[in-house]
Amino acid sequence: MFKRFVFIVLSLLVLACFKSNKKSVKSDKVVIGVLANGSFYDKGYNQSVYDGVVKLKDDFGIKLITKSLRPYPIEGERLLTANEAMAEDAYDVQKNPLNLFWLAGHQFSSLSVKLSYERPDICYGIIDAFDYGDIRVPKNSLAIKFRNEEAAFLAGYIAAKMSRKEKIGFLTGPESEYLNDFKFGFKAGIFYANPKLRLVSKKAPSRFDKEKGKEMARFMYKEDKVGVIFPIAGITGLGVYDAAKELGPKYYVIGLNQDQSYIAPQNVITSVLKDIGKVIYSVSSDYIKNGVFKGGVVIDRGLKEGVIEIVKDPDVLNNRLVNEVVELENKIISGEIIVPDSEYAFDLFKSKL
C-alpha cells in the first residue's frame, strides 16, 4: 500500500511540470530564467544565448531572468566548492517563479539533472550537455547537444588551405576534455586538406583572462610558428584577436559561435556558426505558444538542421575554396563523410582515407 502511495505521489510530481506550463501559458505570465558561465556580452557563445532569449522577450512579452556565474573562488565564501557555488547561483535564479530555466554550458550537465528532480514544477533546458550514459534525462528536462565536429572539420579544412605555415593552432580554456568534438573535427579537416600539417594544441589556465589569451597567441604565432589559431576559450579567446591584429594581416584567426570577422576584419578567415539562440528560441516558443515541452530526451543538432554552419566569404576564401567547402558540407550532410568527435574516431577516420 505504501509503495503504491509513493508511486502515485511521484507520478503527480512528474506531471506537475506540464500542468504548470499550460497554466502559465494561458495566464500569459511566462517567466524564463537563463544561467551562463560568463558574460552575456562575450561576442560569442553566451551572446548567442542572450540574443535568443531577448528575441523571445521581444516577440512574446515574457519575463526574463538572466544571471552569470560568480567568478570562483567567491570572496567571503571560500569554503564552497565550485559545484556548490554553481548550485547557489542556480537557486538564486529559482527564487523567481520560473516556468522554463535554460542552463548554458556543459558544466551545468550534472546540476541540471539534480535541479530537475528537485523542482518538477520547472522545465529545464541544458545546452551542450555531456554524455549522460546510463543516467536517465528527467521528463521535465531537455538536453541539447551539437555536432560541433562538423563545422570544426570545415574550419580545419579552410585553415589548412589558407595557412602560410606548416602548423595550425588550437587554443582552449582549462576544461579542454569537453572540447574533443571540436578538436578532433578540426584536426580531421586539416588532415583531409593536407596530411603534412601539424596541429599545435594549447590550454589556457582560465576562460576569463583576455591578456593571457593575447600572450599565448603571440607565442603560438611567433614561437610555435602557427599560421592560424582556432580559439575556444571564452573571454581569454578574445585576446587572440588582439594579438593577430597587432602582428598583422597574415596572422589568421577562426571565429566561433557568431561571425566574428568584425572583431579583426583582416585576420578572421572564417567563423564556426553555432546558433544556440535559434535552438533556445525554437524550444521556448513552442512551449509559450502551445504549452508543449518535449522533455526526457537528448537531441542533437548540426549541419543538416541548419544550426551549425561555417562562414564562406568569397572575398576572403576565393570562389574555388568556397565551392570545395560547399561540396564537403553536402558530403557531411549526406553521410558520405563521417566526421570524428574523439581521438579513436579520428584514428579510424585517418585509416580510411
List PLM regions with ranges.
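Signal peptide processing junction and immediate N-terminal pro/mature segment
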Residues: 19-22
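C-terminal motif of bacterial Sec signal peptides marking the signal peptidase cleavage site
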Residues: 15-16
